[in-house]
Amino acid sequence: MKIEKSQRNLEIDRSRKNDFLYPLIFREYIYTFAHDRDLNRSILLENVSYDNKYSLLIVKRLITRMYQQNHLIISANDSNQNTFFRYNKNLYFQMISEGFAVIVEIPFSLRLVSSLERSEIVKSHNLRSIHSIFPFLEGKFPHLNYLSEGLIPYPIHLEKLVQILRYWVKDPSSLHLLRLFLHEYWNLNSLIIPKKSISFFVKKNQRFFLFLYNSHVYEYESVFFFLCKQSFHFRLTFYQVFLERIYFYGKIEHFVEVFTKDWGDSLCLLKDPFIHYIRYQGKSIFVSKDTPLLMKKWKYYLVNLCQCHFDVCFQPQKIHINPFSLYKHSFALLGYLSSSSVRLNLSVVRSQMLENAFLMDNIMNKLDTTVSIIPLIGSLAKMKFCNAVGHPISKPTWADFSDSDIIDRFVRICRNLSHYYSGSSRKKSLYRIKYILRLSCVKTLARKHKSTVRIFLKRLGSELLEEFFTEEEQIIFLIFPRASSISQKLYRGRVWYLDIICINELSNHE
């Protein structure tokens, strides 16, 4: 019974394959939706791709060209002869890649909706905040002994990325067109940027490439996760059977036979229900409370799994295993990037079961997180809000917008950062970042009106600064208008929000 259940778990649910993705490539609303989604994704992004030139007329010309013979086969000679295409060469490919990114995500969205319907789970309850990892670490830090991390192979050949989609998309026309587009785009840019075509492609098509890349990594991670769970259920496992698992993806139909082989001398190879795995910033990381020997076994199994079945070159010498104590006092995660930014302290919480009963002191682990000023200033400098040392400067590219639009853009950035770092224990660095954004906003407005900062502030008064208050500050000052000490104490408190599902653009500075 247990074996049959395991066999069912191995079968990937691909019943929701979509046969009608190809016609969507020629629909105008797909590219309009892709453009609007990219524009609204982050106010920080400069629209260097096609925002200023985007129009439905260009979309119609693009679709007309795609309807022509040979579809997307565009040679260098063709681009030189066609004046319109030569001028908008990168524009065409950028728009097509954004359209593909929308289309290939449709089957995955359908699977998510169907899974929610089958489980009858309210969608709001299914949200998972990336900040939930910090409360998780508070309970797990004292019990983890070793950490293994290694770089995931990158880049991967484009053909492998296309092959991954064959499991999810049962539409040969879409796959052929996708393969043709990738190779033509790659070859065309190889003429312009030799030896850097893959990096150029990734930079210009981040969402599309990351979707394909994550789909590829998910394939062998799903196998790895399954075996991690089974190592706990099948505690006494044959070493011969363990080797068979390396190729079990191609032997799903013989899964029962593999597990019903002769049970000879048992070897407890893997027995660790306390292993935790995470993929972060291109690294494969897993931690455990057991011995280094067990970690080495997991390491070489992951290498064999990737190399033998998925043809991914995982180099064992680049996967390092270190005592977890080295990371307990210096940890970088999700934008909290400074050294010693995470410290594990003991917090005493007093509780009383009944009135007039004795008090109980409960010792809890507290994970103190601080905002690192250097990476954030580097991100602000990259976005032209300040110079390299943190002095605010005006934003010339925004000077053509209206006053309300300029203020709204700065306020949104400021509030998003406050929201993202709301769980920080020490927010002095965050106050400096907010000061830089406020002064950069004032300098941008003064530049627009050809005035000085001092004169502009006198004319505008304190109304501008009030715009930068977050919702939390406004509520606190509304409840405690006179008790400034109480309001400051509450505002300095840590609040982890459960609706943060991606890393803030400024926090993800490289």
Curated annotation (Swiss-Prot):
Pfam families: Intron_maturas2 (PF01348), MatK_N (PF01824). It is found in: Plastid, Chloroplast. Keywords: Chloroplast, mRNA processing, Plastid, RNA-binding, tRNA processing. GO terms for biological process: mRNA processing; RNA splicing; tRNA processing. Transmembrane segments: none annotated. It comes from the Eukaryota. One of its GO terms (cellular component) is chloroplast. GO terms for molecular function: RNA binding. InterPro entries: Domain_X, Maturase_MatK, Maturase_MatK_N. Usually encoded in the trnK tRNA gene intron. Probably assists in splicing its own and other chloroplast group II introns. PANTHER family: MATURASE K. Belongs to the intron maturase 2 family. MatK subfamily. This is Maturase K. It comes from Populus alba (White poplar). The gene is matK.
